Amino acid sequence: MGPEEKTIMTERSAAVFIQAWWRGMLVRRTLLHAALRAWIIQCWWRQVLEKLLAKRRRMVLEFYVQQEWAAVRLQSWVRMWCVRQRYCRLLNAVRIIQVYWRWHSCHSRVFIEGHYELKENQLNIQLEISLGLQACKVQQCIPLPLKE
């Protein structure tokens, strides 16, 4: 092998080395672009999943709030119904007492005048009973027992 052959071999190996380096650069660039594209797609997908999760959470919270308000409304209606029933029973009892008092006052010629006031858990009664020249005034506040 002469000096010319050595230069040709050296040039040839240098060309092969440059070509290998260039192909390696192209492959690395292609892999980098593919990795970046995969990373972009993964970021987008994570955002989509996060939005779906936030939407699900909001729907669950709205459903929970709706259930709670329905329970509160139902409890309120039941409490109102119980109080109304109690009020109606007391009003009926007051009317019965009034009928008997009026009958009694009519038959004994006693004049009875008064009024009552029914508040949340109290019955305020004011009565004035007159029998001839004698008069009696009664004012009383009766606490009513409440069953919860």
UniProtKB/Swiss-Prot annotation:
PROSITE patterns for the chain: IQ
Organism: Homo sapiens
Domain IQ span(s) in chain numbering: 11-40, 67-96
Short name of any one Pfam family annotated for the protein: IQ
Secretion signal, residue range per the UniProt entry: none
Molecular functions per Gene Ontology: calmodulin binding
Gene for this chain: IQCF5
This protein's name: IQ domain-containing protein F5
Keyword Translocase on entry: no
Domain of life where this protein originates: Eukaryota
Keywords, sorted A to Z: Repeat
Record-linked PANTHER family: IQ DOMAIN-CONTAINING PROTEIN F5 (PTHR21633:SF24), IQ MOTIF CONTAINING F (PTHR21633)
